[in-house]
Amino acid sequence: MGNKIISMMKKDSKDGGGGGSKSKRMNRSQRKLLADEEMLHRRALSMAIHQAQLSQRFDGSMSRRVGSTSTRKRTLSDPFSNGKQVPDFSESLIVKKFVLVHGEGFGAWCWYKMVASLEESGLSPVTVDLTGCGFNMTDTNTVSTLEEYSKPLIDLLENLPEEEKVILVGHSTGGASISYALERFPEKISKAIFVCATMVSDGQRPFDVFSEELGSAERFMKESQFLIYGNGKDKPPTGFMFEKPHMKGLYFNQSPNKDIALAMISMRPVPLGPMMEKVSLTAERYGKGRRFYVQTLDDRALSPDVQEKLVRENSPEGVFKIKGSDHCPFFSKPQSLHKILLEIAQIP
């Protein structure tokens, strides 16, 4: 494994951010927009630093390093809204609660722009930290099954009022968790949205989706330099974590500099067991769920070809595409992702 990753070169060829004359005067709404985004980012960064400090006691592999090689300039298209009045869609929607489920190594913190924009639209976003992720201080080396890993999501769904339904949104390997949840609670889930995610089929492992990029699971377990041996080198590996340069090239090739810095101090090792577990899905439960897929077209972690293969082999109800997005559209294309989430929510 690794030839594709190790040879990965980071692209920073982006448009600058606007000419001088147009930027001389910024109207009041634009200033407020940028100030609001700055405040949100500072809060997220502060929480991430606090998390990193706490996690040192539980997880020795947590990194506190902050940095980025991105030269991307800030533009007015980056913020979570465009300065115009955001329509309130809540009146026309029956299901208003979104449950946002992060992918491998991430935590609830990664959704901060989506939370802000969905709330502005009159909706009710909820985020979860899966077991061993974000502020959930479980040692990732002890998380061995998808059931354990997804427990915070399952607990949330179990505790919903009897008649309440939610829209699930899963990013990357969070797709396996929302698939598992859809199998468990099809009656509680109005729609499931897979954002460049592992929309697995019955009997498939979440890791299998990445096999074209990472090699076969068997080869990865034997040869990968990213494995973590939480129980000792003489025992099977318990997790994995890419090195910082690899993460930047794989996940964040179009993301803003500040969001890369946030991710670099916030991401945690990925428990290996849940990624290698074959997911059991039935036509009677999972198969009755309404699934939608969001493809990211400048994705280096899960290539557009692989995403296209996923939707061919396990067809969802609808497919949406985001041009110019890396593997983290909540950072690189938040407005586009927000628009798609609203569009899917409004589908009868």
UniProtKB/Swiss-Prot annotation:
The active site is at 172 (acyl-ester intermediate), 299 (charge relay system), 327 (charge relay system). SUPFAM superfamilies: alpha/beta-Hydrolases. PANTHER family: METHYLESTERASE 14, CHLOROPLASTIC-RELATED (PTHR10992:SF785), METHYLESTERASE FAMILY MEMBER (PTHR10992). Its EC number is 3.1.1.-. GO terms for molecular function: hydrolase activity. This is Putative methylesterase 14, chloroplastic. Putative methylesterase. Its main location: plastid. The keyword Phosphoprotein applies. It is found in: Plastid, Chloroplast. Keywords: Chloroplast, Hydrolase, Phosphoprotein, Plastid, Transit peptide. The modification Phosphoserine is found at residue 77. GO terms for cellular component: chloroplast; plasma membrane. Gene3D superfamilies: alpha/beta hydrolase. Residues 1-76 form a transit peptide. It holds the Pfam family Abhydrolase_6. Belongs to the AB hydrolase superfamily. Methylesterase family. The lineage of its organism: Eukaryota, Viridiplantae, Streptophyta, Embryophyta, Tracheophyta. Residues 1-29, 60-80 are annotated as: Disordered. The gene is MES14.
